[in-house]
Amino acid sequence: MTKKYINILKAFAFACCLSGTVSCQDDFLERTPDGKYTGESFYASDEAVLKACEPLYNRAWFNYNRRSMLGLGSLRANDGWNLYMNAEFARFQITALTGEIMQAWSSLHTVVTMSNAILHDVSENTGPDVSIEVKNQAIGEAYLMRGVAYFYMLRIWGPCILFENNDEVVLNPTRPLNPEEDVLKFVIRDFRRASEYLPEKGINGHASCYAAKALLAKALLAQSGWNKGGTRDEDILDECISLCEEVIDKSGASLIDYENLFKYQYNNNEETLLAMKWASPVTGSWGETNALLSDLSFSDVCDVNCWGGSWVASADMIELYNQELKDKKRLKATFFTYDTHYDYIKSASGGYTYDKKWIQVKKGVVGCKEDVDGQLAVMASPLNTYIIRLADVYLTHAEASLGNQARLSGGRGLECFNAIRTRAGIDPKTSITFEDIIRERRVEFCMEYCNWYDMVSWYRYRPDFMLDYFNHRQHRNAFIDNNNVEINPDGSIRYHFWWRDANENIYWSDALRDEDGNVVQSIADGYVFDLESLMRENGVDRITINESNVFAPYPEADVLQNPYLSMDPVPYDFGNDK
């Protein structure tokens, strides 16, 4: 038995143990599963079926959520970065041996294999007391989560290995890649099926059909322009818009206060359409809690062991906030800035006021034990991880409405765009462009582990535009250190690195200043903060993004055991689903 074969069996075993479809004996890996499931007795009741689906909301995602998604979804987008942790993601230096790449690959395939197992067992191995409503809920959830996993994989790796039958993979684990367009078609088919099976209101907090329709709209938006030469398919856009309006008008979801979105007390809030739901460290076990806590938090704001104090905003992100000086609600919820007060952190002592001249990451930081009813431990918080929330649907509508136009000047798409801005406390726009969409999405979802995925979809839609954006406008590889960030009287953020001119004056982003902070030359007097030139002059390597590194490498262990991962993809057999 090859190592690859054992790895496939391990993934299969883990998924099946989570869903309860097979016995979790230590000797499972010593033999090929014989296909005899215990599902008949396990799925004897509605409660048993729903219980079997619960790991699809946490355990199956654990290794992806643990650290991989931070690097893949946020650091590659240049939301922020950490010079000392996962910097290879921000620098586009990940390799086939990068641990987080292997964890993401394993975790996302676990979601797929577990979903496949549930689809099989709920269809074949349920007792007479299981209701059709619960069967449909479980089948819909399995399609939904499998679609989510493949949607992530598509935008991480490009071509993927599609499979629907776990037994076939066990018998033949060496399988070819399938092309991006087929993966996207598969994702859309899964979301469409999920929307047909899931109820309008999920049972006991499980997913509803509107979660599936929201994700279907998002996948269709990606498909509308994917490798289509810079244009979007209008028919696909029309369906996308229709789905968005259905979710907005009928789901019952609503936009809530932005800062509350990232407090554990507001888990499962009215804006949530689908999320990874993490257990309390008090009652949950390893694999069921949100392990990102210790990576993101630091000792000033957390009383459990943590090591995340060096996560900071990128210069690129700071400039996006400076474009809209009223955008303080989202800034406060996303990054700590000088003299900002948080009454819900260290709440027992009157709150916490950030006193550093820096810009550390705030999202994912929930405070101390006293702030979360004691539900905190090392690498363990109960804060949900959003997969999709209603704001995403609003901006999907806006982008689809813009479509192939250079500018959108009215209609419901513009209203949706402005609804997000109104919630943020900034002025509505009378018209929007593609660049407005990019800016709004990046700020709205900054440090929510998803911005890079939208950038990949945009890259497949408008590759030349996005390569220029990546390589000439994002100022990658420039780390802003402590004491190098200040707030101007008008609310804008100024920052600098350690670079000085011949007279020891410091190149700040808003002016040339002496060591005491006095302005030597202002922008009005001709000062230009040319960050790209300063980086080159001071030995900061340029990060070049192109077709060869937009997508991540496949894990080396899998490449060595599966030669197909080094070959061209082959079309997927969709059978009668043409």
Which residues make up each language-model segment?
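Conserved, well-structured interaction surfaces
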Residues: 45-64, 84-157, 173, 177-185, ...
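Short coil/turn linking the two alpha-helices of tandem helical-hairpin repeats
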Residues: 154-156, 161, 202, 222-231, ...
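Long, intrinsically disordered, low-complexity segments
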Residues: 24, 108-109, 186, 264-299, ...
